[in-house]
């Protein structure tokens, strides 16, 4: 509601010590900072006794500066928000507190109250801009609300919901104004938030990350398709989503650091088949969180040294179960490369490339399952002799003849200037086809599933000049993705971790340039 009212969201609650009584921090349409303390009293009342119990938090809310450098020197408006009613005695106490602050020379420490009636009035005023009225989306939402919440987020169902509400379905583009698209982006955000109800109740942090990454990409896609300004129509919603993603990553990190043994789910023996794949995913996600914290600052409840130790100690658990795991391992490689240098680090690239072009004793390509197959699919395929071949989703799959990642991994290896190593691996590289799927348009690239596009298949020559490989590896031009996604490397990297088939060679080259400062060939080319 605040975003729809013209506020820019700066912070949304994680309930950590650094908040200083401020659950939500915004900058309103007049550039005035606002801080909100949220209290739940559904169907109830905030009594005088209840007010006294939260008095220390209210003091922090009104008197302590907002803990953000750009807002620290401007005093903020302070709001107590409750979804209940405030009793008369509590209202009188708040008025007396405000009067005392004014008498003492601190009129700026005034506490304002937003209670249930005010929230309902705001919702009524925003009307359809707050809540989607499309029956189909409500039906999809109800389907998602019955999910238990302890599994993976339902990408396919969410994709249908987002495409319908944001005008991203196949066929002619709806004739919507920018205001209508903006309204629908806000509505979609609310639907996503509601769809996470059961996942949040089970503290399923990965589901929350997945949902908000998918939403953010879809919001960018809507602006791209309707050719409207992202800054004016979707940035506020995406910024809020990014706050939620970062908070969920921090919560995931805290849980991973506190577990002993780390990352085990349920029975240790039964979990053994899934343990390393889960560990690899978490290492990739938390590697990206490390970059995020390095860029925006470390929260008080997550120590840099602890996270780095966890990431380094987990290296032995990296598991290349299929090409879908490569973006996860690349994220880890970028972290490792930033914190350590040397051939041992870049050797991880060689291991990945070697695995994608591996051959049998008869020089037949062996390779890995394509990025369209999940770990569950790969596991069912491996267990088909036990579970039955009718349960094998990959029964018709032929691996090894082509690779979605060999070309991009080769280019990253070329950037290390390992000429002799590339020469040695080239015979195996030249036996497979480089393949990628290019969606028809930039907005379709942002979707988790796209029906339209073309496959690009290239058979590498038996011999290739080193200078030609260098020229290819230097390119950091990315034409496939919209600029708002390219300009947010953290979001883009999370997007390809979730949807690895979007990690085309140009996307991998561009992301690697954003996260990896090492560059041992001539300067990059963005043209």
Feature locations, PLM:
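Charged, amphipathic alpha-helical stretches
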Residues: 1-4, 81-84, 519-527
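Acidic metal-coordinating catalytic centers involved in nucleic-acid phosphodiester chemistry
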Residues: 60-236
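Short acidic, S/G/P-rich loop/turn micro-motifs used as interaction or catalytic elements
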Residues: 41-45, 83-90, 336-339
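Alpha-helix boundary/N-cap detector
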Residues: 49-52, 56, 149-156, 240, ...
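Extended amphipathic alpha-helical scaffold segments
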Residues: 153-366
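Long, low-complexity regulatory tails in eukaryotic proteins
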Residues: 295-527
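Catalytic centers of nucleases
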Residues: 1-76
